[in-house]
Amino acid sequence: MIQGAQTDFIHILKKYKKSKRYSELQELHIQCVVDELKGNNKEEHFHKFFEVLQSSLSTIGSFKFLVLCHKLIYQLQQEFAIRFIQNKLIPGDDTDKSRLAIYYYNFLFKLCENFDYYKEVIEFIETDNIEKFMKYELFVQIQILYPLAQILQELSQVVKLLDYLLCRESPLLLQLGTCILKDFCYTF
């Protein structure tokens, strides 16, 4: 395990949340989501977000779980945008932005503090078990990003197929399962 990640995960995360860089990342997150909702060009905020993230990581050390956390949260933007558009909550004034921020970061904090998930992810990466990591990522995406019953039903069939293919010893079946998994990760 990464030094400190197992014994002091929550403490480090809370300390990081109080830092100036984390506040800047929060603001950029919100602005990127607002850009997404309004259909604005988000390239500037997108690049700035990763600049700040890189700077942050060089300060606190090589905590891979923070990279994964921010990358996964960044992937959630489209889902948040869809939900807000469906509920006609396009942010226009500060009140709407505050509501968006509360909704967005309540979810962020819950995800960040899910130590078991990050412990698994870190172990997958450190043991170079990429197939297992990708498969686990797909399960997480299904559970978190796509809670609708119809989508779950469709994807559960894919998961069963992947589970079968990825457990085979045949290199060809393993390769097939990996290709399907990659395709679904990119698609969704």
Model feature map: region roles:
Residues 1-188:
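Eukaryote-specific intrinsically disordered, low-complexity regulatory regions enriched
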